[in-house]
Amino acid sequence: MTVNNPPIEILQAEVDAWIKTTGVRYFDPLTNMAMLSEEVGEVARIMARRYGQQSEKESDKAKDLGEELSDVLFVVLCLANQTGTDLQSAWQKAMDKKNSRDADRHHDNPKLR
């Protein structure tokens, strides 16, 4: 890992430090869950208008998908910190499961050709 590509545990620590200094404290988990839904909605709006069939409004054109995805990640990291979830370990377990369970699953899928 490089400084430009930190492991998830470093991102979790960075969010925790920001919350405890600039943010004062974490919002309660249910508030963060609502905020996560809001941020995902902002991503959905961009996707529907920029990559889907909805027309993109002039006011939507300046919105940055990467910034909105980062907002989603920030709230996910907050929720992980609040619940004591080690996302680095959870990520590795999820990838191990996908690599073993889905190793050949998608190769014969005609929808992906």
Where are these regions (language model features)?
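Flexible "arm" and connector segments at domain edges
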Residues: 1-69, 73-113
